[in-house]
């Protein structure tokens, strides 16, 4: 029996990346970063702000707030 685990973090980040939804990333020190998610892995998020890329470590992130609602897809068809 195969157990499917839902990784909400990856689903959320992948959707904002694919749909080009602008986000505000709030860091644990209170700083805000705004831009588009270009990629991510287990430890980092790449954010594009006005053509400049920033590699942000996930342990420094407090909150990610999208500029519009994100359609969360929980099935295998949503993976790319």
Curated annotation (Swiss-Prot):
Keywords, alphabetical: RNA-binding, Stress response
Statement: the UniProt record of this protein carries the keyword RNA-binding: yes
One MF annotation (Gene Ontology) recorded for this entry: RNA binding
InterPro entries: Hfq, LSM_dom_sf, Sm
Domain Sm span(s) in chain numbering: 10-70
One of the record's GO cellular component terms: cytosol
GO biological process annotation, one example: regulation of translation, ncRNA-mediated
Position of the signal peptide: none
Pfam families per the UniProt record, alphabetical: Hfq
Role description: RNA chaperone that binds small regulatory RNA (sRNAs) and mRNAs to facilitate mRNA translational regulation in response to envelope stress, environmental stress and changes in metabolite concentrations. Also binds with high specificity to tRNAs.
Similarity-based family: Belongs to the Hfq family.
Assembly behavior: Homohexamer.
UniProt-recorded name of the protein: RNA-binding protein Hfq
Gene assigned in the entry: hfq
